[in-house]
Design a protein with these regions (language model features):
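Nucleotide 5′-phosphate-binding alpha/beta core
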Residues: 2-103, 107-210
């Protein structure tokens, strides 16, 4: 069905209107329409979060039903408030099943790193967002863009488990853009090695994105 086609397949079929609508259609929403969607999504998350161990570690038995109740019942938190559960990577305490754990450094924290769980639906949202960014970065006006599977992308990113490492993986599900150097090689290099080789390859092959 049309639903399961990815960006590359739609480009092959020259479905440019559908591509724009799917990934960039949100730009046509009014502020009210946009906020309505945001509120609905937020309330969905509140429901899931309130019913899991992580949420209840903050809520202590309370169950906010909407955004206003959530704001009244839930204090401002920092990573510190979630650290014990997240650092132990306890999936049964979370609102969804994590398929990957991302990490960042934790300056001044009680542990050298912070970890964050990503569920499949979070990765799907991330994939849609990076694809929209890719399209918009080549766009001069509404509906016009210039993306092709033959494009080259400089791999100047920190690899997994850092969040930027998700980028090539997410994009690969949509379009087989070539990274310079190739992702499998890049992840085993130091940052400077990766950049030096990437720029060298770009001079030989050309470069569409960085």
């Amino acid at each position: 069905s049309g639903q399961t086609m990815n960006l590359e397949e739609k480009l092959k079929k020259q479905q440019y209107k559908e591509i724009w609508q799917q990934y960039c259609g949100f730009l046509d929403l009014s502020m009210d329409g946009y906020m309505k969607i945001q509120r609905r999504l937020m309330e969905e998350q509140i429901r899931l979060w309130s019913n899991c161990g992580l949420g209840q570690s903050i809520l202590k038995g309370k169950h906010p039903k909407n955004l206003d109740e959530f704001r009244k019942m839930v204090p401002l938190t920092t990573y510190d408030d979630y650290a014990d559960i997240l650092l132990a990577k306890q999936p049964d305490m979370l609102p969804g099943n994590p398929v990957i754990w991302i990490q960042t450094t934790w300056e001044g924290g009680k542990h050298p790193i912070k970890v964050a769980p990503y569920t499949r639906s979070m990765l799907d949202t991330y994939r849609n967002n990076v694809t929209a960014c890719l399209i918009l970065s080549t766009s001069k006006e509404k509906g016009s863009f210039d993306v092709a599977a033959t494009d080259k992308f400089l791999y100047a990113l920190a690899p997994l488990p850092f969040a930027t490492g998700l980028f090539p993986l997410a994009l690969r599900e949509e379009i087989n853009i070539e990274f310079l150097p190739a992702v499998n090689d890049a992840v085993n290099m130091s940052f400077s090695e990766r950049n030096k080789l990437g720029f060298k390859m770009a001079m030989q092959k050309d470069l569409g994105f960085f």
